[in-house]
Amino acid sequence: MEDSARLIVQYLHVLAGIMWIGAGFYTIFVQTPALMAAPPPARGAILATLAPRQVFYLLRLGEFTILTGFLRVLVSGRSREMSELGSRWSVSLAMGIVLTVALLGLGHAVLKPGVTRLLSLGPKAAQGDQAAAGEAAGIVARFKTLGYVQVALGLVIVGTMVVARLA
């Protein structure tokens, strides 16, 4: 039973991580360029439908990845090693945890309020409000930067998890 629990928790953790980091890749390299290629009048309707759903999805996947990661440590039987930070396993896992929590924190601090603000600016910008259009462009630029940060951190996090798995 113990092996089954470890296998299930590890599977869920890896699947959630792939979906979370993969969503970042998809957003930055496929979805955003496609959205920017759409005619400006169409962007608002697409964004209003897509953005809240996507933010919800990204944040829940990040939270589930972290939850299953902690469960994975508990069911691994190696949780005592985390207090020592003397092994390659514990150091790489600690690095991965810190980076993952930081990435989720960025999502909650930047992405969620930014999307809310962007959706409130959209109708004003569409009516010709230059200040709203400028602020919206700034938010989109921050989102693009955040997307690249998510991709980069995601690759580092995956690397730390591979090191931990092989340790």
Where are these regions (language model features)?
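Polytopic transmembrane helical bundles with strong interfacial aromatic enrichment
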Residues: 1-167
